[in-house]
Amino acid sequence: MAEIKKKPGRNHGVRHALTVEQQRAFMNYTANSPVFNHWAPLFTVLLGTGCRIGEIIGIRWEDIDLEKRLININHSVTYYPRRAETTRCEFAVSLPKTEAGIRTVPMMEPVYNAFMEEYEYQKENGFSTVTLDGMEGFIFTNRFGNLHNPQAINRTIKRIRENYNAEEILKAKKEKRDPIIIPHFSCHHLRHTFCTRFCENETNIKVIQAVMGHANIETTMDIYAEVTDMKKTEAIEKLSHNLNIF
């Protein structure tokens, strides 16, 4: 991967990914919270696929193949917030802007389990009846049966983060250790977090680009280069520890 270099003048690292510790803390707290555990399937799918928030808001049961464990990304849902008193908040279905956006994403085991959990819940409590631009059968809806909007998801992330951090600080103090603090982040950071984990474990840039749906491979390369920089520091620290000769 020596040919991958950062281009001068590009703004790198503006949207930071969660660390593995932070990601694990966020998901564990969400899944085990009686207040927030119903959000766990949505966040699992976001963190386990790297899909854009609009792609997951718009995903339907017919877009996933549970037998082959594949997700077909072929459209997105855009949320238009109210701009004036006379204008309503609206959703609209849109097609991917580029061919790269139309793709198939394999399900990892936790993602498959999240879909199955959601399916069993809806099988017992009722499936979504929302219709949008002729589409129906949407998987993720709110408690009112409507589609989620990114602003509401971000508010939930904020509540989870604040509740977790408050409890973690007290717990860490009691256990006499440093707390694992979750920083401010939005639903858009979850895509970047997935891509970062992917880059940490995969060296084939084209595979990463295909799964992420990046139209321009430079976008993928930028994230890979950023991860490589972090890995270099970790590798040197590990080497120093293992050598133990200085």
Explain the meaning of each model-derived region:
Residues A17, H38, G48, E55-G58, ...:
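Gram-positive cell-envelope targeting signals
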Residues M1-I53, I57-I59, L66-E67, T78, ...:
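Basic, Lys/Arg- and aromatic-enriched nucleic-acid-binding interface segment
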Residues G9, V77-Y79, T193, M212-E237:
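Catalytic-site neighborhood detector that most strongly recognizes the C-terminal catalytic loop/helix
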Residues N28-W39, V105, Y121-T131, M135-L147, ...:
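Short, basic (Lys/Arg/His-rich) helix/loop patches that form interaction surfaces
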Residues H12-G13, N72, P81-R82, V93-E117, ...:
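C-terminal catalytic core of Y-nucleophile DNA break-rejoin enzymes
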